[in-house]
Amino acid sequence: MLKRLTRLRLTPEALLIAGVAFANVVLHLVLPEYGYHRDEMYYVAIADGFSFSNLDMPPVAPLYLKLFLMLLGHSVRVVHLAASACGALVIVFGCLIAKEFGGKRYAIVLTGVFLVFSGLVIFGSLYSYDDPSFVVWSGALYVIVRLLKGSDQRLWVVAGILLGIGMLTKLTVLFLGLAVFLSLWLISERTWYRRPWIWLGAGIAFIGALPYVLWQRAHGWYFLSYATTYAGRTTHESPVLDFLWNQVLPNNIALLPVWLAGLALLLFNREWSRFRFFGYCYLVLCGTIFCLGGQFYFMMPIYAVLVAAGAVWIEQWFAMRSNPERPRLVPRICVPVAYVLMSLPALPFFVPVLPVDLLVRYVKPLGVNAGVKTEDRQIAELPQHMADRFGWEEMARSVAEVYRQSQSTSHDTVGIVAGNWGEASALHVYRGAFDMPEPISGDGWFYFDALQRQAFRESYVAIGVSRSVLQSVFRHVDRKGVFTHPHCMPDENNNAIYYCTGLKLNLGKYWAVSKRMDSAFENVLRREGVDRAVEFYHERRQQDPDAVLFTERQLNALGYDYLKQSRTGESIALFRLNVEAYPESFNVYDSLGEALMADRQYARALENYTRSVELNPENKNGRKKLEELKVILAMHPG
C-alpha cells in the first residue's frame, strides 16, 4: 500500500495536476516585486547562518529555503520560487483529494484553479514557515482521506512522519493533531484507537518535535516567553464575527459558495458520510483556533478539502444535467473562467500586481485592510503584508552611510545593532551590497546568534533601539540620522540612527542577561528579599567588577511590580539599585522619583527628576513632574 501511494503514474489526471501546479509557480514568478518582506529576510538570515545549536525557530522552513538559496542564489525571485513551490504541492494534494472523493478530470482541474486563487495565493508571494507547514497539513489530510477509504492502517505511520516534520516546521500543526484526535471520536472509525498503528503514528509525530523541545528546554523555554510577548505586542485577537469574516475575504469571497457547498456535503449528505470526519475536523479547527486566539490563516489547508468536495459536487451536478452524447462544454468552461475573473479585483490586496502609488489609491475605498487584521501594529496607506515589503533597502543604505562616517572617525571596530529582527534581517540581507558587518540584535534568532559568535565590539551604529537603552550601555549616544520612507510600516518610519561609543560595561555579559536577569540574583531576590538581593549584587560586583546581573528595563519593571503591590520601600530600594547600576540613564531617575513621590519624599523626588531632565532635556514626563513637585513643596515646605 505504501508503494502504491508513492508510485508515480503518468496518467492524464497526473498531467492535469502537474499542469495546474506548474501554472501556480509561473503565476508568482511573473508577478511584479515590491521587495523582500520582513519575514522573508528573517528566514534568509536564519538559513544563511543555520546551525542546529540555535533552534530558536524550528529547522525545516530555514533548511528548505537554504536549499533554494544554495542552488539558485539570493534574490526575491528565488525566495518566492520556494514559496510558490510549496503552494504547488498544496494544490497537488488538493487535486489528489478531489480524485479520492470520486472526482474526474473536470473536478480535478476545478480544484486546482480554485486553489490557485484561494487564500493560498498570498503565501505564494510571501515565504514564511507557513508555506512548508501547509504542505505538511495537506499531505496529512490526503493520507487520512486514503485511510477513510479503507487503505492499510499502516498509513498512520506516513501521517505520523508528516506530522513529525510539521512539528519541526511550525507548532500550529498541533491544532491539526488535536482536530484529528477529537473528530475521530465522532465517527465509526473511532475503533481505530484500538489498533496500534494510529498510536505509532502519534508517537512518531511527537518524536519529531524532540530536537526543538530539547533545545528550548536547555535555553529556558525561550520560545514560550517570546511567543507570549510577541502575541501581546502585535497579534490581533479577532471577535467572533471578525474571525468568521476572515474565513471569507482572505480565502477569496468568490470561493465562498464552493467551500460552503463542500462543507455542507461533508456534514449532512448521506452519500458523503464516509468523509464526515472532515466536516467535524473543520468545525473543531475553527472553534479551537478561535478560542485559543490563533490566526485565521492557521487553518487554511483544510479549505483544500472543502474546495475539493465542492468541485466534485459541481462536476456531479453537470453530469446529472448533461447528455453523454452532447456534453455541455460551454457551461463547464464558464465556471473556472468566471471564478478567475471574479478573483482578479481582489488580487492586488494579496499579491504584488499594481505599482505602489496605484495600489494606495486602489485599496482606499474598501479600507487599507478591508476588515482583515492579523496584527495590532499601526498601519498607514498599505495593508501590513504589503507595507512590510517597503523601505528595507533604503533603511540599510541609511545605516551604511552612518557606518562609513563612524569608521572614518573611530579607532575602534564599529558594529551594527538593530532593535528588532526585521531590521536586523534587512541589514543582514543588504550587508554585502553596502559593505557592512553582520548585525546583532536582542530579538529572536539574532539574540542567540550573537551569544554564540561573541563578536561584540566597542562602538556601534544603532537603529530601532531607544536612546534610554543605549545610554544605559554607552557613555556617548549621538543621533546621526533618521530613516524615513513613504510606504513602510509606521512603526519603522522616522527611525533614529545613533552612533554609540564609550562602552560602560561588558557587552557579552550584558547580552547574556538581556532576556532574563541573572538566575542567582533572581533567586536571592525571590527567596530572601530585596535587601539581601542588593547585598548579593554588591558581593558579585566585588568579585567581578564586570558582572552584569540585570538590565535597566528588567529591574525597572520589577520595581513597578512592587510599587503596584504597595511595597513602596522595596520598590525604592530596587530603583536605587538601578540608579547605581545605570547612573547615566534618565529613565532610572524618573522611576525612583515616582516611587519617592508615592512615599511622600518630595524633596528627594525633586532631586531625581531634576537629574532625569538634565540627562534628557526632551523628557516631557520629567518636566511635568518637576512642576508638580514645585507646587507640592511650595504648599508643604517641610
Regions found by a protein language model. Give the residues of each.
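Transmembrane-helix motifs of polytopic, lipid-linked glycan transferases
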Residues: 81-102, 116, 139, 143
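Membrane-interface transmembrane helices that cradle and orient dolichyl/undecaprenyl
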Residues: 99-105, 140-156, 190, 263-271
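Short acidic/glycine- and proline-prone juxtamembrane loop motifs at membrane-interface regions
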Residues: 119, 125-133
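Specific aromatic-rich, kink-prone transmembrane helix
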Residues: 93, 113, 133-149, 155-163, ...
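Membrane-interface alpha helices of multi-pass inner-membrane proteins
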Residues: 49, 111, 143, 155-170, ...
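Transmembrane-helix signature of polytopic, membrane-embedded enzymes
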Residues: 13-15, 94-116, 135
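Short helix- or helix-capping micro-motifs
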Residues: 20-21, 110-118, 163, 167, ...
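Transmembrane-lumen/periplasm boundary regions of multi-pass, lipid-linked membrane glycan transferases
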Residues: 165, 174-275, 289
